[in-house]
Amino acid sequence: MYKRQMMEKLSEICAMPIQLAVLGSGEASIEEKMAQLEAGNKGKIAFYKGYNDSLAHRIYGACDLFLMPSLFEPCGISQLISMRYGTLPLVRETGGLKDTVTPYNEFEKTGNGFSFANYNSDEMLQVMYNAIDVYYNRKEDWKILVRNAMNTDVSWAKSAETYCQLYGQLHS
């Protein structure tokens, strides 16, 4: 259902003031739809079927926003790579995505990306529109988010410290 909804929303996404780069493979019907959208939206959509690590890193570095609307994601590394490059992740709050992406708070000027809770295309689009609004109309907030994303500590040292604190609490 969600995949079908997303495919139906692609024309709305194409109407947004953005360019879209899609890298990956999946169901044949989705790949075909992406190829059709690319053909009909030259300069607006680029689709690369398959995976190319070098291209992936160029995409991370060139983008402003990295969309990762996963149904299930036990950890996820793509959002971490995107943050290191200064590309803000827009994720569905699941698994490791929820653990690593702190959503933008416009009042406190905090966060390192954008997120949505429910697995539906309308909620995702609403958050996309918000992210685009921040990008175009609240440039200082965007810069803060990029800085926060690039400074997000996802090192093993931080994880080890968290585990040591947890074990210390259990031992007490």
Set out the residue ranges of the language-model regions.
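Conserved small/polar residues in nucleotide/adenosyl-binding loops
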Residues: 1-5
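Active-site-adjacent structural elements in folded domains
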Residues: 6, 50-53, 130-131
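Short acidic-capped amphipathic helix/loop micro-motif used as an active-site/signal-coupling element
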Residues: 7-11
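Nucleotide-activated donor-binding/catalytic signature segment of Leloir-type glycosyltransferases, i.e.
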Residues: 14-58
